Amino acid sequence: MNTVSNYLSALREAMKAQGLDALVIPSADPHLSEYLPAHWQARRELSGFTGSVGTFVVTVDEAGVWVDSRYWEQAAKQLAGSGIELQKSGQVPPYNEWLATNLPENAAVGIPSDMVSLTGKRTLAQSLTAKNIRIEHPDDLLDRVWSSRPAIPAETVFIHDPAYVSETAAEKLARVRAVMAEKGADYQLVSSLDDIAWLTNLRGSDVPFNPVFVSFLLIGKDNAVLFTDQGRLNAEAAAALQTAGMTVEPYAQVADKLAQIDGALLIEPNKTAVSTLVRLPESVRLIEGINPSTFFKSVKSEADIAHIREAMEHDGAALCGFFAEFEDIIDNGGSLTEIDVDTMLHRHRSARPGFISLSFDTIAGFNANAALPHYSATPESHSTISGNGLLLIDSGAQYKGGTTDITRVVPVGTPTAEQKRDNTLVLKAHIALAEAVFPENILSPMIDAICRKPLWQAQCDYGHGTGHGVGYFLNVHEGPQVIACAAVPGPQHAMKKGMVTSIEPGLYRPGKWGIRIENLAANQAVANPQETEFGSFLYFETLTLCPIDTRLMDTAMMTDGEIDWVNRYHAEVRRRLEPLTEGAAKAWLIKRTEPLAR
């Protein structure tokens, strides 16, 4: 078994053989995915740091992993004694600046071409240019050092059940081609896997939690080529591609195909790996912009939203069963760990119709663990749920008819007045945005302040964004919209009818507890639009169906309108979920949706 020290030695030997002064190994794949197949988990394997995001840098005599504050504690433990330094992003210079400072003039930096985007390479090059430091792509180096490297995944590709699809692949391609024509593009290269899955109406299981498949898609004016291995397509998928006018070529041949084109190529530079463009003729003109399909797939049809509502009902019923079982065990003196919560949730969800998988790793954090917004319990490091405290559960699932993502906080034992105060502040923030009416096309970062106002008034805040887009039986995180005051507003953030977005304010007390209340919501046109000169307005239709624990609400802090919102929401939750529950789950649902009174 290779140790990190063995890997470091092997990396440095390989670097020396190739004339490299430094090697950069990012958390990335050729599709710039959030979740990576094992084949591209080189940073995790070679550094020993298992967090989901980080950048590993090796020089002749130094090594470091750059991680953000979510992972400082984890990285400190995992890197201890390895010869790799923890570099705390935000407190130290970024890795590109560190390289520029620490490397000599005319040095060579290696980075695998399939693990860096065009934008990423440009940013790195800009930092290194003053010292004339060149960038090279040692694409065989990782394979030689990582002898047990897993193969590129090639799981079966299948169609998205036509009962849940409201637009054919051919119709989607026609919409993309219309945008290509507007921009003067002869081709578009699509590298992001959720865009490809959406455009083809196909799904897969190559990537954990995301129903996508490793591939590229090259769209021409009158043809389209899907780069994936033909043998992994089931009969229905192969027939569907033929019907849509798409041909199939091997995954590895995308760069060869691009070497044969001419004219203008539309790409999204921060979603396109350098490896795909290495043989692109110099005569080809690049047109850069966000993938047209990113905008199209963010707007769900009425039929899509109807299916999402149904998925939410099944998800909510599963949660009722889970919480009923959880409370019964805890109230009767039983013992559960954070790991048990994950296992129980999966069991209840997997019994529901249309369930495919979880949509991300469940976050179950008790007390101080919940103060880490992206905490993940492991068999080696987790807490037992006992005594008094707060349990935060952020979880979700993939169903044929939609993707779910929900966060709830429940008390264990007797909550304190401070815990109820914090929870009520978060609830007030959630309600403020959930009830908002806003102009269509407003830039999504601009509405974040609506949510944060109740917390700001109490001189509280949270460090993460308030909302992200959610796919339709696709990735739980998608764009282009993002509700986050830290985001620089741009035209890509325009809020459109049919978008599905999370609303998830939080409040975190390090070492004590964390609170987050998350529902998904769809942008809908207001019921009675006013015919005025001010344009069209939207509101949020709450999609998620699960009680919010009233035991943590301080009604003295709430307005009559906020209490009314809770009661209307709980009445809808009960109405929709009661027919889908029975026994203990139904009893729990009724108990937790009793009207809130002062």
Model-derived segments and spans:
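Active-site neighborhoods and metal-handling regions in enzymes and metal-associated proteins
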Residues: M1-R598
